[in-house]
UniProtKB/Swiss-Prot annotation:
UniProt main location, coarse: other
BP terms from Gene Ontology: photorespiration; reductive pentose-phosphate cycle
Oligomeric form and interacting partners: Heterohexadecamer of 8 large chains and 8 small chains.
Family: Belongs to the RuBisCO large chain family. Type I subfamily.
Gene Ontology cellular component list: carboxysome
Enzyme class: lyase
Cellular compartment(s): Carboxysome
Documented EC number(s): 4.1.1.39
Cofactor: Mg(2+)
PANTHER family for the chain: RIBULOSE BISPHOSPHATE CARBOXYLASE, RIBULOSE BISPHOSPHATE CARBOXYLASE LARGE CHAIN
Name of the protein in question: Ribulose bisphosphate carboxylase large chain
Gene symbol of the encoding locus: cbbL
Site (Transition state stabilizer): residue numbering on this chain: K326
Keyword Oxidoreductase: yes
Taxonomic lineage: Bacteria, Bacillati, Cyanobacteriota, Cyanophyceae, Synechococcales
Length: 471
């Protein structure tokens, strides 16, 4: 060895705290919210995160002399206060692109949120945002189809897609499940959906469900003259079973399948997205288990990161919460990660939780899916928040209609078209929501009953995970 090797332990900040560093366009940038143990300097905590998520370990090792750590190491180049939290701070870290396998979200997350989250010097650690360089994005497959192609496949333009989750989500036989699908689609919905936890249980094996659903979709298409679909959940306990289910959906000439991307894993999701791209299949993505990871405001991974990772891994639709329904998520935060699903360039905007400029290049966009505790009274707000490139899914807000699922579907369709018409006429649909819906209900008894049924239903709970912005 030509260089002198000094054995022992040295402080992380001696190597990984580099405030003079100017990030390169090819660097992957990450923002962590850090809360260190009492008495540990911020610079040491931040440098430890940079080290343990890149090339570092707890001790100096002789094999460092066999490579160029200055080239490969992560660098903490900036520290910022967290508004309203004197114990926490933001650490901005730059990683050279060569640390990551091309196109592998699995590898990126293994590095950034691997062992470092169990580090004793930290009380809490949260990955708030990632700036993926365009050089990495170009190695990812991304959405197998994207918004434009999906609209062309479904022949739906000028409005959000309208759907619902089949309820009860567990317990129905395959035949009865297919009957509910048919009622919803003939009533006016574009799409129906398996819930995240319907796979292949004793009361309803997956092949039986697929066959009855396909029959229902095709019958509804013939009767309405519209393209219909159902998200067939292909999530399975093995990759082989996953692809067997996808292949059978293709044999049945179904337009769209579904995957639970967090419980299923990014490796499985990327593989399924590649299969969908090759086989002309749309891919709906559910985010089951996300709140375990993203809801704590000080520890875990923010959903904006999980949403960005999904766009790169591959999916044509992704659940994002509703703002107005039963699930966590404030308006500005939700708009922030919806932007990162759909836009080609998203500027840094702390008011929406975006810590970096994000250039997506020519990667197709992803439909934002609003689902969870929504009903017809929410329709104007949903249209205003999510816009046209979204899918609005009313589960209980369809099946809970006193006249049944078909009437619930009809009510939602009338409400949506009334709101789109009002918006296109220049009306302020959120401010005039009651007038717009009541006018439409004069010509739709289904909508009138729905408005009466859910007039008192609200989910007015404060958001747990709030944006860290200066008040």
């Amino acid at each position: 060895m030509s260089k002198k090797y000094d054995a022992g332990v040295k402080e992380y900040r001696d190597t990984y705290w580099t405030p003079e560093y100017v990030p390169l366009d090819t660097d992957l940038l990450a923002c962590f919210k850090c809360t260190g143990q009492e008495g540990v300097p911020r610079e040491e905590v931040a440098a430890a995160v940079a080290a343990e998520s890149s090339t570092g370990t707890w001790s100096t090792v002789w094999s460092e002399l066999l490579t160029d750590l200055e080239f490969y190491k992560g660098r903490c180049y900036r520290i910022e206060d967290v508004p309203g939290d004197p114990e926490a701070f933001y650490a901005f870290i730059a990683y050279p692109l060569d640390l990551f396998e091309e196109g592998s979200i699995t590898n990126v997350l293994t590095s950034l949120v691997g062992n470092v989250f169990g580090f004793k010097a930290l009380r809490h650690l949260r990955l708030e945002d990632i700036r993926f360089p365009i050089a990495f994005i170009k190695t990812c497959g991304g959405p197998p189809n994207g918004i434009v192609v999906e609209r062309d496949r479904l022949n739906k333009y000028g409005r959000p897609l309208l759907g619902c989750t089949i309820k009860p989500k567990l317990g129905l036989s395959g035949k009865n499940y297919g009957r509910v699908v048919y009622e919803c689609l003939r009533g006016g919905l574009d799409l129906t959906k398996d819930d995240e936890n319907i796979n292949s249980q004793p009361f309803q094996r997956w092949r039986e469900r697929f066959e009855f659903v396909a029959e229902a979709v095709k019958l509804a298409q013939r009767e309405t003259g519209e393209v219909k679909g159902h998200y067939l959940n292909c999530t399975a306990n093995t990759p082989e079973e996953l692809y067997e289910r996808a292949e059978f959906a293709k044999e049945l000439d179904m337009p769209i399948i579904m995957h639970d991307y967090i419980t299923g894993g990014f490796t499985a999701n990327t593989g399924l997205a590649n299969w969908c791209r090759k086989n002309g299949m749309l891919l709906h993505i559910h985010r089951a288990m996300h709140a375990v990871i993203d809801r704590h405001p000080k520890h875990g991974i923010h959903f904006r990161v999980l949403a960005k990772c999904l766009r790169l891994s591959g999916g044509d639709q992704l659940h994002t919460g509703t703002v107005v329904g039963k699930l966590e998520g404030d308006r500005q935060t939700t708009l922030g990660y919806i932007d990162n699903l759909r836009e080609s360039f998203v500027p840094e905007d702390r008011s929406r939780g975006n810590f970096f400029d994000q250039d997506w290049g020519s990667m197709p966009g992803v439909f934002a899916v609003a689902s969870g505790g929504i009903h017809v009274w929410h329709m104007p707000a949903l249209l205003a928040i999510f816009g046209d490139d979204s899918c609005l899914q009313f589960g209980g807000g369809t099946h809970g209609h006193p006249w049944g699922s078909a009437a619930g579907a009809a009510a939602n369709r009338v409400a949506l078209e009334a709101c789109v018409k009002a918006r296109n006429a220049g009306r302020e649909i959120e401010k005039e929501s009651r007038d717009i819906l009541m006018e439409a209900a004069k010509h739709s008894p289904e909508l009138a009953i729905a408005l009466e049924t859910w007039k008192e239903i609200k989910f007015e709970f404060d958001t747990v995970d709030k944006l860290d912005v200066q008040g």
